[in-house]
UniProtKB/Swiss-Prot annotation:
InterPro entries according to UniProt: Acyl_CoA_acyltransferase, Leu/Phe-tRNA_Trfase, Leu/Phe-tRNA_Trfase_C, Leu/Phe-tRNA_Trfase_N
NCBIfam families: aat (TIGR00667)
Gene3D superfamilies for this protein: Leucyl/phenylalanyl-tRNA-protein transferase, C-terminal domain, Leucyl/phenylalanyl-tRNA-protein transferase, N-terminal domain
Reaction catalysis annotation: N-terminal L-lysyl-[protein] + L-leucyl-tRNA(Leu) = N-terminal L-leucyl-L-lysyl-[protein] + tRNA(Leu) + H(+); N-terminal L-arginyl-[protein] + L-leucyl-tRNA(Leu) = N-terminal L-leucyl-L-arginyl-[protein] + tRNA(Leu) + H(+); L-phenylalanyl-tRNA(Phe) + an N-terminal L-alpha-aminoacyl-[protein] = an N-terminal L-phenylalanyl-L-alpha-aminoacyl-[protein] + tRNA(Phe)
One term of GO molecular function: leucyl-tRNA--protein transferase activity
Record function comment: Functions in the N-end rule pathway of protein degradation where it conjugates Leu, Phe and, less efficiently, Met from aminoacyl-tRNAs to the N-termini of proteins containing an N-terminal arginine or lysine.
SUPFAM superfamilies: Acyl-CoA N-acyltransferases (Nat)
GO biological process annotation, one example: protein catabolic process
Compartments, as annotated in UniProt: Cytoplasm
Name recorded for this polypeptide: Leucyl/phenylalanyl-tRNA--protein transferase
Entry GO CC: cytoplasm
Amino acid sequence: MPDDLTPDLLIRAYANGVFPMGDDDTGIVRWHAPDPRAYLPLDAFHIPHNLRRRVRRREFSVTADRAFASVIEACADRARTWITPRIIRVYTELHERGYAHSVECWQEGDLAGGLYGVGLKGAFFGESMFYRVSNASKVALVHLVRQLRAGGFTLLDTQYSTEHLERFGVTTVPRPAFEQKLIRALDVSPDWWPLADAEAADLDTPVSEFSAAAPTLRGNESPPNG
């Protein structure tokens, strides 16, 4: 693929199951299409018991698209990272166009953790997550999955599998099988973030029973106080 990294190129790449990663040393962006490909079946998401208890206690306030820049910069803030300045720039542009999204966990007004990814029709491509308070990124993932299911998404791509992700139900399929799942997802027109925070945290109630819609929160709004 060409080296000119633009939002339009990214959208086309994701629609074909391809994603970029930057080289921390050279800044070069390389394109990836793993085989096998990892994804999280939304109807088989497993929440460990201890995490389920934390979500129910609502230790964090959870929002979407309220602090995208802070989330992606926090995800990049580690000793070695593929989230280079070029990656940050183009994903920020994607966010401004409504394709890249962040999920934030707040505690007493401070950003405690979160994740970001790309939403394209009925597919969500998870990119990275971080935490400053224990379990904050996991709580963000729980809320993301609840919201995706409620909104009608059909595919949550995790790109690669890790032992950590497998605890939540992540599995792998051959690349051709993933591409078929992606094709079906691209025929879906879902709603982004339809549930209120309390509804997403109510793990005892199926998401299908909620009908109230919460507005999508954009990155220029102020963080909550707790």
